[in-house]
Amino acid sequence: MHRGLVAAADRAPEPDLGEILKTAKTVAVLEGVGDHENIGAIFRHAAGMGVDAVLLGSGAADPLYRRSVRVSMGHVLRLPFAHLEGGFTTWQRSLQALADASFTLISLTPNPHAVHLAEALHGLDKVAMLVGAEGPGLTEHAMKATDVRARIPMAPGTDSLNVATAAAISFYE
């Protein structure tokens, strides 16, 4: 119930990953982002920055949950998304489909030894940006599946950003 309105609908089938990858140039890949507000914000940022699709790995919250839809300003209903197959330590195998479709897989990390994000993105045609849960970030399984580990430069004394904020910055770059 929202402002006196109730709606019920059947979920449309998710698009096939292969179909998404045929035309996409930029995709977001989310691992363990379990907060519905962060999911909604990431979809809103992705839509605003021209990301073509969002791929959901293990532990990602349901983008069609009421709070996610609301925070996204409805963009979860417009932006294609698909769940990657597999469990907590096996979903990363689905990333091979992105590599096979000529995507460069970039993982966001606060690690000071990672490449500067702008440098990592320079000259790339097709990008899959992986972001992980707030706090733990991406698992080592996910990090190993990527081509480049990239960081967002931050002021001294700041060690991390909210996952939706970090995603927005990476989509803008």
Across the structure, where does each feature detected by a protein language model lie?
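Acidic-residue sensor for enzyme active/binding pockets
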Residues: 31, 134, 173
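Short, hinge-like loop/turn segments at secondary-structure boundaries
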Residues: 2, 71-75, 123-126
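Structured adenosyl-cofactor binding patch, chiefly the S-adenosyl-L-methionine
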Residues: 7, 45-49, 60-80, 140-173
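RNA substrate-binding interface of SAM-dependent RNA methyltransferases
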Residues: 14-113
